[in-house]
Swiss-Prot record:
Source species: Rickettsia bellii (strain RML369-C)
InterPro entries cross-referenced by the UniProt entry: Mrp-like_CS (IPR000808), Mrp/NBP35_ATP-bd (IPR019591), NUBPL-like (IPR044304), P-loop_NTPase (IPR027417), YlxH/NBP35 (IPR033756)
SUPFAM superfamilies assigned: P-loop containing nucleoside triphosphate hydrolases
Amino-acid positions noted as binding ATP in the UniProt annotation, renumbered to this chain: G105, K106, G107, G108, V109, G110, K111, S112
Highest taxon of the lineage: Bacteria
Protein role: Binds and transfers iron-sulfur (Fe-S) clusters to target apoproteins. Can hydrolyze ATP.
One Pfam family named in its UniProt record: ParA
Gene3D superfamilies, per database record: P-loop containing nucleotide triphosphate hydrolases
Subunit organization: Homodimer.
Single GO term (MF): ATP hydrolysis activity
This protein's name: Iron-sulfur cluster carrier protein
Keyword Translocase in record: no
């Protein structure tokens, strides 16, 4: 038979659910397929342990329906319960009225392009806007905005670069082109803190923060240390993308950050309907479903205005 794919595994487990309503696909991670042998982890934190063996047997039975599947290995994991600590006072960013995160569960979904589009759209609507490129894994905002200069420092404060009437600051300004960024979580979080707090913003209505993909140290640091107004989540229609986004939704809901809405990018390129499904399931607005527009990619490459090609309706959400 042909090699197995992750989507086949997810499809077979799609409707299996725990008694509390949690779908098995929401708590699966680390799917490994080798020579048609399959292995994955299931996070059983907070789930009745009496159900675990039953769910495991059901999953194995469903997976064995796949012709030619080999050995099936399921590992159960459980997050440690962390004692609640007294909440630290959160920081406001000087001269910034609202801070909006743009996040995604995984990389490669067009999050930076959407971040730039949101910033340019708000600027077009006569708001004073800034954008922070906090994506340490691939800072692309300077390129999208056509910036080649390094910010100046005056009196110990970083002066953001202005492009397309938007104030821009990026980790990419301080890293040589094509250099790998190898930072541990605390160092990366400290750098983001400096980008936010040491930068001299000029009375902004909105500060858009292009976050790294996933739910790592930087996300937790931002949520715990700053007054934030909300997050826009970017996804694609695939089921695998949906699984990653569910983890992001869970994080933001647990830490009480309002989820402004979901933007489904590349909506016509992949099978699935992730954005609409997540919107209905979690009662989160679906801001837009954006098809693949080759001219958008070209505009990013050539640092052209994105709002000439696509406009988002943001007024009812922000």
């Amino acid at each position: 038979m042909a090699d197995l794919h992750q989507n086949q595994i997810i499809d077979k487990l799609h409707n299996i659910a725990f008694k509390d309503g949690t779908f098995l696909k929401q708590v699966i991670s680390n799917i490994i397929i080798k020579h048609n042998n399959v292995g994955f982890s299931i996070d059983i934190s907070g789930i009745d342990k009496l159900e675990v063996e039953e769910i495991k047997n059901t999953a194995i039975k469903k997976l064995n329906e796949i012709v030619g599947i080999g050995k099936i290995t399921i590992v159960f994991t459980e997050s440690k319960t962390v004692e609640k600590k007294p909440q630290k006072p959160k920081h406001f960013v000087e001269n910034v009225k609202k801070i909006i995160l743009v996040a995604s569960g995984k990389g490669g979904v067009g999050k930076s392009t959407i971040s730039a589009l949101i910033a340019q759209q708000l600027s077009l609507e006569n708001h004073r806007v800034g954008i922070v490129d906090a994506d340490i894994y691939g800072p692309s905002i300077p390129h999208i905005f056509g910036i080649n200069e390094v910010p100046q420092t005056v009196g110990g404060r970083i002066i953001p670069v202005r492009a397309k009437n938007i104030e821009v600051i990026s980790i990419g300004f301080f890293v040589k082109n094509y250099s790998a960024i190898i930072w541990r979580g605390p160092m990366a979080s400290k750098t983001i803190y400096q980008l936010l707090s040491v930068t001299k913003w000029d009375n902004l209505d909105y500060l858009i923060i292009d976050m790294p993909p996933g739910t790592g140290d930087i996300h937790l640091s931002m949520l715990e240390n700053y007054h934030l107004n909300g997050v826009v989540i970017v996804t694609t229609p695939q089921k695998m993308s949906e699984i990653d986004v569910v983890r992001s939704i869970d994080l933001y809901q647990k830490l009480n950050l309002p989820i402004i809405g979901i933007i489904e990018n590349m909506s016509d390129l992949f099978d699935g309907n992730s954005g609409s499904h997540l919107s209905q399931k979690y009662n989160i607005p679906l801001i837009a479903q954006i098809p693949v527009i080759p001219k958008i990619a070209n505009a990013c490459d050539k640092s052209l205005p994105l709002t000439d090609l696509l406009k988002l309706s943001l007024k009812e959400y922000l």
